[in-house]
Amino acid sequence: MWSYLFGSGNAKQKKELPKKAILELREHIQLLSKKQAHLQTQMTSQEESARHFLSKGNKNMAKAALKRKKVFESQLLKIDKQVDSLEQQLYSIENANLNLETMKAMKQGASAMKHIHEGLDVERVDETMDEIREQVELGEEISEAISRPLYTGVNEIDEDELDEELDMLAQEEVARKVMEPGAAVPAAAPATKVSLPSVPSSDMPQQDRGQPVTLGMDQEEDEDERALRELQAEMGL
């Protein structure tokens, strides 16, 4: 029962294995880094001892100090390689763990999408959209029916018929005023006076048959000159 609720112990251990490996690798790299610093200090100390013994003329002790320095240097090189290997392994595990977590997240997302789409397909979506369109159209028809006036006969009156009836009433009103005692009879409209061109009293000069008729040329020239003068006056010339 407990394994059903909380999962089996092996599954939990497998899940914690990458984190545990990363933690142990980091701790071991820190330990080796401290060892590197210690060996570097020992190498510096032995080199100073060799210089001291050499200054005192004790070559054997100076040589022994240099040998110890070489031993420390050899150990330091080995530890450097170990640190490099551990760091590469650490980076690989971290990258693999990151990929694993990414895949888990993607898998959960795919499962969620699958669960969402279980009750959906193209046919059902089309049916639902058709139902929505039908309801929208029905709503528009209902709105149009509600906004329609109750007494439609008022809106069906012919406007031309109203205008004719109005004209008849106006004529009747004019006739009634004329028939009243003492009403002034409307005077007829004065005739429009039409001005005709004057006929010259003297005879028109006869033109020779060989010469072109110049009737109206002088008048046209006068009009052109008058138009030219008006234009000059407008331009201030």
From Swiss-Prot:
Topological type in the membrane: Peripheral membrane protein
Keyword line: Coiled coil, Cytoplasm, Endosome, Membrane
Disulfide bond residue pairs: none
GO molecular function, a single term: identical protein binding
Residue runs in coiled coils: 67-141
InterPro entries, sorted: Snf7_fam
Biological process according to GO: ATP export; intralumenal vesicle formation; late endosome to vacuole transport via multivesicular body sorting pathway; peroxisome organization; protein transport to vacuole involved in ubiquitin-dependent protein catabolic process via the multivesicular body sorting pathway; reticulophagy; vesicle budding from membrane
Sequence ranges of Polar residues compositional bias: 198-209
Annotated GO CC locations: cytoplasmic side of plasma membrane; cytosol; ESCRT III complex; multivesicular body
Subcellular localization, as worded in the UniProt entry: Cytoplasm; Endosome membrane
Bias (Basic and acidic residues): 226-237
Pfam families: Snf7
Main subcellular localisation: cytoplasm
Region Disordered, annotated ranges: 187-237
Tagged with keyword Coiled coil: yes
Main function: Required for the sorting and concentration of proteins resulting in the entry of these proteins into the invaginating vesicles of the multivesicular body (MVB). Also required for the proteolytic cleavage of the transcription factor RIM101 in response to alkaline ambient pH.
Family according to the record: Belongs to the SNF7 family.
Subunit structure: A component of the endosomal sorting required for transport complex III (ESCRT-III).
Name of the protein this chain belongs to: Vacuolar-sorting protein SNF7
Species whose genome carries this gene: Eremothecium gossypii (strain ATCC 10895 / CBS 109.51 / FGSC 9923 / NRRL Y-1056)
Gene, per the UniProt record: SNF7
